[in-house]
Regions:
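N-terminal glycine-rich anion-binding loop in soluble enzyme alpha/beta folds
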Residues: 12-14, 18-84, 165-199
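A short, acidic, amphipathic alpha-helical segment used as a generic capping/interface helix at domain edges
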Residues: 81-87, 200-214, 219, 226-232
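Conserved beta-alpha
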Residues: 121-189
Length: 290
């Protein structure tokens, strides 16, 4: 039954952005559904509405602990739960569904191609487009033209770090370094799900600055897991290390913006934001005719 798959459903508490855009009357409000992991206070709903310049509604469901155990095998075995959660959100009017949690998209998969096929199978059964953070990160690296990412795995334990490293490498990218807090000599949360209760911005900065120094030939830094929030310091991080930084959170939001055709606050996701801005090709032509 659905109650065994979902721990909490927040369908009655939709959040809508209050930003206004010049052509808002002509824009249909998008409704995005988020599937979150159990055991933490997911800030994604608030953050999506904060960065979108277009009207957007966000609905959420949280997977139950018995179907999303914090192990790699537990994450890999969530197909049915994700499908039913996505179908539930679609039935309540969501145009698009995203899985908040990097490992939900890649755990148990050898590379991004396999993960993408799995995601498509789940989406087809649910009857709604679905974005997985684990594939969104790879897609956004592609938009940036990055081929040599360093992987800052923050609080993820060694087996998760190694599996993520292999996944990214097997996708065809030249991983320069993968390290978690322990590898970097950083004292921070190291157990799940407790670690999801948001490592401090200072810890995340230490991890990013440290891996940039240890792997100077990198052309981007990827920060996982989802509890390591980068949105509110992404521009500062990029300024310090001198290269693009993709958080699990910012990569997911970038992918959502592309899929839902959302205009975003300028620079809010760091360097990747400029790749998401629609270009009005009619404006120069109109000027030329004057």
């Amino acid at each position: 039954m659905m109650t065994h798959l979902l721990q909490a459903v927040a369908l009655g508490k939709r959040r809508e952005t209050h930003h206004k855009c010049p052509d808002e009357a002509a824009i249909m409000t998008k409704t995005i559904g988020l599937i979150s992991l159990p055991g933490w206070d997911d800030p994604a709903v608030q953050e999506i509405t904060d960065i979108s310049l277009d009207p957007v509604n966000v609905q959420t469901v949280m997977l139950a602990e018995n179907v999303a155990a914090y192990t790699l095998d537990g994450m890999a075995g969530t197909d049915e739960a994700l499908m039913k959660a996505a179908a539930h959100l679609a039935g309540n009017g969501c145009d698009l569904v995203a899985c908040v949690g990097t490992s939900l998209g890649w755990a148990g998969q050898p590379n991004t191609n396999a993960a993408r096929l799995r995601g498509r199978r789940i989406a087809a059964k649910a009857g709604v487009p679905m974005i997985m953070t684990g594939t969104a990160i790879i897609d956004m690296l592609g938009l940036l033209g990055a081929r040599r990412p360093a992987l800052a795995c923050t609080y993820h334990p060694t087996d998760w770090k190694n599996a993520w490293h292999h996944y990214v490498f097997n996708t065809g990218l030249d991983v320069t370094l993968a390290q978690n807090f322990r590898d970097a000599g950083i004292v921070g949360p190291a157990s799940l799900p407790e670690a999801l209760r948001n490592p401090s911005p200072e810890l995340i900065k230490k991890a990013v600055v440290g891996i940039a120094a240890d792997a100077p030939d990198s052309d981007a830094i990827v920060v996982t897991g989802m509890g390591a929030r980068t949105l509110n310091q992404i521009q500062a991080l990029e300024a310090v290390v001198g290269m693009p930084v993709l958080g699990a959170d910012t990569a997911l939001y970038a992918s959502l913006a592309l899929a839902a055709d959302l205009h975003l606050v300028e620079g809010c996701l760091g360097q990747i934001t400029s790749y998401l801005t629609p270009v009005d090709i009619s404006a120069p032509k109109a000027a030329e005719t004057k």
